[in-house]
């Protein structure tokens, strides 16, 4: 994983992004910052909107994002985290509890889970694909596959639809 000063994760070069895709990526970075630095939701949203989204930061040009989408994801994850985390935990394998995942992966899964739950207007395949792409921007190993499997299981539980995964059954 690449990083810039202050420990914020930065993605590898992604494919051409749309404004919602950029908002998703920024939301994951903001959620990471909140998790690692203990930054509050109002503070992190204000910082991203004032200094990051569509701006140049340390020689890197941030793309324009849909600010309402960004705010909705960040605020929604914060508001629903106590409901989302147990759902994510159930979708993980028993030997990988949510607490064992790094902050970036937790942020990706929380944002994806929130979107599956709250944004019924967005197709499941779009949500899963977008967050798998975000995972690919940060990771080169098995993490994107994990994101795909977990979000697919969550889609089955939340929406009753899936792209192929089966729900995890306890033995």
Curated annotation (Swiss-Prot):
GO BP terms in the entry: DNA-templated transcription termination; transcription antitermination
GO cellular component: cytosol
Tree of life domain: Bacteria
Gene Ontology molecular function terms on file: RNA binding
InterPro entries referenced in this protein's UniProt entry, alphabetically: NusB-like_sf, NusB_fam, NusB_RsmB_TIM44
Keywords of this entry: RNA-binding, Transcription, Transcription antitermination, Transcription regulation
Entry's family note: Belongs to the NusB family.
Role: Involved in transcription antitermination. Required for transcription of ribosomal RNA (rRNA) genes. Binds specifically to the boxA antiterminator sequence of the ribosomal RNA (rrn) operons.
PANTHER family recorded: ANTITERMINATION NUSB DOMAIN-CONTAINING PROTEIN, N UTILIZATION SUBSTANCE PROTEIN B-RELATED
Protein name per the record: Transcription antitermination protein NusB
Organism: Brucella canis (strain ATCC 23365 / NCTC 10854 / RM-666)
Source taxonomy: Bacteria, Pseudomonadati, Pseudomonadota, Alphaproteobacteria, Hyphomicrobiales
């Amino acid at each position: 994983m690449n990083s810039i000063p202050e420990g914020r994760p930065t993605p590898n070069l992604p494919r051409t992004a749309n404004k919602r895709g950029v908002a998703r990526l920024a939301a994951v970075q903001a959620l990471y910052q909140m998790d690692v630095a203990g930054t509050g939701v109002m503070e992190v949203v204000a910082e991203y909107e004032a200094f990051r989204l569509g701006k140049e930061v340390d020689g890197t040009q941030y793309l324009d994002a849909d600010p309402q989408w960004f705010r909705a994801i960040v605020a929604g994850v914060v508001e629903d985290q106590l409901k989302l985390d147990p759902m994510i935990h159930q979708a993980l394998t028993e030997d990988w509890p949510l607490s064992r995942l790094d902050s970036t992966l937790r942020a990706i899964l929380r944002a994806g889970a929130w979107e599956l739950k709250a944004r019924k207007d967005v197709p499941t395949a779009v949500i899963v694909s977008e967050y798998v792409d975000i995972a690919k921007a940060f990771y080169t190993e098995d993490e994107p596959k994990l994101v795909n499997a977990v979000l697919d299981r969550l889609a089955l539980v939340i929406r009753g639809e899936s792209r192929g995964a089966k729900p995890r059954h306890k033995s």
